[in-house]
Amino acid sequence: MPRVDDDLPSDLPSGLTPEEFSAGIFGTAEPRTGRGLELTPFRGVRFVPEVAGDLASVTMPPYDLIDEAAALRLLAGGGHNIVRLNLPRAAGEGYDAAGDRLRRWLDEGALTTDPDPALYVYEASRDGTVLQRGLIGAVGLRAESDGVVLPHENVFPGPVRDRLALMTAANANLEPIFLVYEGGGDGERAGDPGGGDAARIVDDTAAGRPLMEFRADDGLTHRLWRITDPALHARVSADIHGKQALIADGHHRYATYRALQARHHAAGDGPGPWDAGLALLVDSTRYPPHLGAIHRVLPGLRPDDAVEQARKVFRVTDFRDEADAVEALAEVPGPAFLLGGDESLHLLTDPDSGALARSMPSEHSPRWQGLDTAVLDHLLIGSVWNVPENEDAIEVVHDDPSAAIARARRTGGTAVILNPLKAEDVLAVAGEGERVPRKSTSFGPKPRTGLVLRVLDHGR
């Protein structure tokens, strides 16, 4: 088995905290300057079903949602699943092997390059209900100081090194990041669905026959259309130019785009494909994303100990029925948490104001300090429970309270169920140059990986 760590890039700074690393790679938050939001067409690379196989079997969820067991299942299926490109380490291979495979699949005809530059319309639906619809293109990379593409989470050097090594070896963007922006219009007038001109172009395009369509094992139907008309490209550019985009998902991949761009600029390279990165851009006025909560499981914290200590600073209400407890949590307007793991569930509300003030980092804004995840991290986990912040002590479960509670009961630990953050709070915090605490947001639906790739070779 090759030593896959040998080809990790060495030109990223080391020894920095996530805050320091993120500030350097995104760019320090300052008043808005520079060019506006750009999404440019590109010649997409797509699977050819007649050669590669059924599209449901060659695509996958985003790489960071794939654990080792899921990756092995995808690999066991053989064939051309994009996991062989996007997660080469799961197969014990180095990054260069993924790049070689990409070029081999292009030569064999399993992948094809579209003849003309295009923007792509992507849609995810369930049982005929559209959950997600937006534009896939090459988003212009901007320093955070430009106020155009806004991160809301810090990033870690390790995942950026991994993605940068892969992106360098493949010379390609293998999956899109997920961006949202407010296109304008409130959609409250009769016949007005909301959104800007770009959203209207998206809907008009989606009324036609899709380029590809399939139902995947996630229960969603995925569709893709292609826009090649330069006049429509120009309308999209004009509509989004003055907008801000929030990174809903893909902070480490966006940081990787920025690292690759910085590498080329440091080498004296002029403008090129490294000045943009593959992205799905969604008008949230027209198609609001689902913003789910990320629940915590603390395997080493007994439920009775957790509740006893929490009573010192929270009002605790006990429930026997899970559905009633989750519903009660959803109705609480302020910081609130639901603890599970034993036979009962325990709703924590009304945190002690003095304890809250003492536990909160003073350098953050009042809006940041009011986020449920900030209260959880600094008051409950850090101060009351004194649990270290690491992956062994704190596990996460996306969206599903029942799964988190069941996990806690299996481990003898404590589950902490949260309400989702409000999208407007996330955007406001990001707009001030702050980061929400780690594992605060779960935007969705996330775009399927493998629908369209962006190869950076000029000749492709």
Regions found by a protein language model. Give the residues of each.
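Surface-exposed, charge/polar-rich loops and edge strands
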Residues: 2-460
